[in-house]
Curated annotation (Swiss-Prot):
Region annotation Disordered: where it falls in the sequence: 306-331
S-palmitoyl cysteine lipid attachment residues: C10
Name used for this protein in its record: Probable staphylococcal-like nuclease CAN1
Covalent lipid sites (N-myristoyl glycine): G2
EC number(s) given by UniProt: 3.1.31.-
Cofactor notes: Binds 1 Ca(2+) ion per subunit.
Bias type Basic and acidic residues, positions: 318-331
Keyword line: Calcium, Cell membrane, Endonuclease, Hydrolase, Lipoprotein, Membrane, Metal-binding, Myristate, Nuclease, Palmitate
Residues the record lists as binding Ca(2+): D149, D225
GO CC terms in record: plasma membrane
Signal sequence interval, chain numbering: none
Membrane-topology annotation of the record: Lipid-anchor
Family: Belongs to the thermonuclease family.
Length: 331
């Protein structure tokens, strides 16, 4: 009898390759270890209840399901993203606050429904020459457009570019805020929202209206300079940009970062090159000091010839000269 107990206890202490495969991320190994532990003892981990809203009886039901799906998984999850997808698929019919809290407990990323479903295969399209990285945004909010050449966008943290970089405390705060809002504890939710925002994140709606955690980026449209808000045609330029992008998901090719910490990039909306439209409508100048692309000069010339937008004025002032005069006190 004593030997049997000894072998049983040793079995609990020894990690099984089935649950903790070689090379697994520490967060994945922790989840695998707890699933193995539950199979042997029927005990859920201490501390999980602080992250979820359901009872320990319900939690035990989750681990029963995870035992089955974990054993069937081929290959066994090794990365946080793989483990998160398995958890979301296994617990898809459970409360969102529970699923997110479970993921936060293990330090796993919180994917949305779209991210948990494999995307259809598409041909690889190389990035333009000089492009450092590419962003795919969530739908743009009306307040995101500062003027005719600057826009704030948000990237879902389930995106492969972001998923491994979200601080664990921000994942935890987002899950806690979701639960606080569900419980109508708006004071707590507002405090957590400030913490999330201070770290450069925000919970925003995705294309299906589901609130997801997202990373904030400020984008400066590459190659154009729109009139400042206080300049003639400044408000019209802002409205033109807003009309194009509001409620739309954008593709952004980022080439550089300016001195204000903004990403300098080309923006596409439904396949349309946004800077091209801004120039053709006479809503911006070609910013030749920073971008000499001939097509930008051509589109600006077309607007000038047609006296469109800001070119309807006899002598429109260049935004960079207006800013210089303002700095010098001569504006």
């Amino acid at each position: 009898m004593g030997n049997s107990i000894y072998r049983f206890l040793c079995g609990l202490c020894s990690p099984s390759p089935e649950y903790q495969p070689h090379g697994a991320h520490p967060a994945v190994a922790a989840l695998g270890r707890d699933i193995q532990q539950f199979e042997a003892t029927s005990q859920v981990p201490d501390g999980l209840s602080r992250h979820v809203v359901s009872s320990k009886k319900a939690q035990a039901n989750w681990y029963k399901k995870l035992i089955v799906t974990w054993k069937k998984a081929r290959p066994t999850p090794r990365t946080p993203e793989e483990a998160a997808r398995l958890v979301v698929t296994t617990l898809k019919n459970h409360q969102k606050a529970d699923v997110e809290g479970f993921l936060v407990f293990y330090g796993l990323p919180i994917p949305n429904a779209a991210a948990s479903t494999p995307a259809p295969h598409t041909a690889h399209v190389p990035k333009p020459q000089g492009c450092k990285f590419e962003l795919h945004t969530l739908p743009v909010d009306a307040k995101a457009v500062a003027d005719g050449d600057t826009i704030t966008v948000y990237i879902d943290t389930a995106d492969p570019r972001e998923s491994g970089n979200v601080p664990r405390e921000i994942q935890k705060a987002a899950a806690e805020r979701t639960r606080a809002r569900a419980a109508r504890d708006y004071q707590k939710a507002d405090g957590l929202q400030k913490m999330i925002a201070d770290a450069g994140y925000r919970q925003v709606p995705n294309a299906r209206g589901e609130e997801v955690l997202a990373k904030k980026y400020r984008i400066r449209l590459r190659g154009i300079d729109a009139p400042e808000s206080a300049m003639p045609y400044g408000k019209e330029a802002k409205e033109a940009l807003l009309k194009m992008v509001q409620g739309k998901s954008l593709k952004v090719y980022v080439y550089d970062e300016d001195r204000y910490g903004r990403c300098v990039g080309d923006i596409y909306c439904d396949g349309v090159f946004v800077q091209e439209q801004m120039l053709k409508k006479g809503c911006a100048w070609h910013y030749t000091a920073y971008d000499q692309r001939p097509e930008l000069a051509k589109w600006e010339k077309q607007a000038q010839s047609g006296r469109k937008g800001l070119w309807a004025a006899s002598r429109p002032q260049k935004p960079w000269e207006w800013r210089r005069d303002k700095r010098n006190g001569t504006a």
